[in-house]
């Protein structure tokens, strides 16, 4: 099952988003940025500003693998969505 959350500034969604992120720590996720680039890897940390730390990260552009990173930091204001992926 794939679960997706979008960024939102409303306080009603804060608890649901926090619970979603807590559930995703240590799991594979896809993070899509506003510019269309996707990062796929293991979610390690996410903070209240949507800043994200991932491990085993791969960068995709137009569905094609561009680069592999060990660790990756994504600034929250660039995040369009985070999608939890099934465990492999």
UniProtKB/Swiss-Prot annotation:
InterPro entries xref list: Lsm6/sSmF, LSM_dom_sf, Sm, Sm_dom_euk/arc
SUPFAM superfamilies assigned to the protein according to its UniProt record, in alphabetical order: Sm-like ribonucleoproteins
PROSITE patterns: SM (PS52002)
GO cellular component, one term: spliceosomal complex
Disulphide bond pairs: none
Alphabetized GO MF terms: RNA binding
Domain Sm: 16-88
Keyword Protease among UniProt keywords: no
UniProt KW Ribonucleoprotein keyword: yes
Localization, UniProt: Cytoplasm; Nucleus
Keywords per UniProt: Cytoplasm, mRNA processing, mRNA splicing, Nucleus, Ribonucleoprotein, RNA-binding, rRNA processing, Spliceosome, tRNA processing
GO biological process: maturation of SSU-rRNA; mRNA splicing, via spliceosome; tRNA processing
Gene3D superfamilies tied to this protein: 2.30.30.100
Description of how the protein assembles with itself and partners: Component of the heptameric LSM1-LSM7 complex, which consists of LSM1, LSM2, LSM3, LSM4, LSM5, LSM6 and LSM7. Component of the heptameric LSM2-LSM8 complex, which consists of LSM2, LSM3, LSM4, LSM5, LSM6, LSM7 and LSM8. The LSm subunits form a seven-membered ring structure with a doughnut shape.
Function: Component of LSm protein complexes, which are involved in RNA processing and may function in a chaperone-like manner, facilitating the efficient association of RNA processing factors with their substrates. Component of the cytoplasmic LSM1-LSM7 complex, which is thought to be involved in mRNA degradation by activating the decapping step in the 5'-to-3' mRNA decay pathway. Component of the nuclear LSM2-LSM8 complex, which is involved in splicing of nuclear mRNAs.
Family from the record: Belongs to the snRNP Sm proteins family. SmF/LSm6 subfamily.
Protein name (Swiss-Prot/TrEMBL): Probable U6 snRNA-associated Sm-like protein LSm6
Gene designation: lsm6
């Amino acid at each position: 099952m794939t679960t997706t959350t979008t960024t939102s500034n409303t306080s009603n969604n804060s608890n649901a988003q926090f619970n979603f992120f807590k559930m995703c720590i240590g799991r594979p996720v896809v993070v899509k940025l506003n510019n269309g680039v996707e990062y796929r890897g293991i979610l390690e940390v996410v903070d209240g500003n949507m800043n994200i730390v991932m491990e085993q990260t791969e960068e995709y552009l137009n569905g094609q693998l561009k680069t592999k990173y060990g660790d990756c930091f994504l600034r929250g204001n660039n995040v369009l969505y985070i999608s939890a992926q099934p465990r492999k």
